[in-house]
Amino acid sequence: YSVTRQTGSTIKPIGAYALGIEYGLVNWSTMLNNSPLYQKQDMVIRDEDYCRKNGLMGLSDKQLRAYPNAWRSWPRNYGGNYGDNSDIPLWNGLARSLNTIAIRVGDLVGASNIFNFVYNTLQLNTLDPVNDVGLAQMVMGSQTHGVTPTALAAAFQIFYDGQYTTPHLYTRVLDRDGNIYLENNATSYQALTPDTAYVMNRLLKNVLYSSVGTAGGRYPNSNGMESFGKTGTASDEKDLWFVGGTPYYVTAVWWGYDAPYDMTKTLGKQQAKTRTCVMAWKALMEQVQADLPYKA
């Protein structure tokens, strides 16, 4: 729970989407274009594979402009497609975890605003203040070190009522006479407005309950209580995530190796993308909530 890993797409809701709604820049049904933010001809993003194969890695961006094929469109969606250039509603893009949609929201919000929010307000302080202030890091989740499962779970608690409480393992320790021996004064504060938290909660419900969601149909059966969540896959499928919330709990599930390794080589691409982490979370929630009373 204390090892840092790249977040992949799990950072999208706590940064770009939450702030986009909080700032009034987007809403549930905002139409966004399903295409790369930067096209190859814009010469903004290097094609590192091409540059490496052709001995161009040492060239500056200015020098590289002489090589049109040294650039690529960015970003791609999971699986390598660049979208279909259609306009789709925000809720659909989030449910499907489309990078092409999230990056447009992130561009509206601004990478520095996202970083300041997740680093300072949500206390994801293992992020790098020098190297992680960019759209690739703040929207796509390709950070220098990443964050811990504990910190990521704590960040997602804001989607209940907008409040953030610092993670803690105990509240107090009493001696045998009932006197307080140790007290852990956790800090709580409002990170988002309740209205934004509610909209985000409903948006993230689609990940589990919509037929287009990346974890569609894999919500826990817990006495009719609803859930929300977000899948995540880091670069080269070395880190798999699911962060899910219920009216009682927020839980982060990370799946990977101590020495990072492509999980699709052992699990298969579809299993790695959509099933492993969310099914572990689903089984856990059904067990721990089995005897709990209904809570909205």
Residue ranges and their predicted role:
Residues Y1-I14, S29-M31, Q137:
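Short active-site loop at a secondary-structure junction
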Residues Y1-V3, T7, H145-A296:
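A penicillin-recognizing enzyme superfamily signal
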Residues I21-T30, N125-P129, D161-T166, D291:
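Secondary-structure transition/capping motifs at alpha-helix termini
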Residues Y23-G24, L37, Y248, D258:
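Solvent-exposed coil/turn segments that connect beta secondary-structure elements
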Residues M31, N92, A102-G106, F117, ...:
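Structural recognition of the beta-strand scaffold that forms the well-ordered cores
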Residues V109-L127:
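Short, charged, amphipathic alpha-helices and their helix-cap/turn boundaries
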Residues P129-G146:
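A glycine-rich, coil/turn loop motif that links secondary-structure elements
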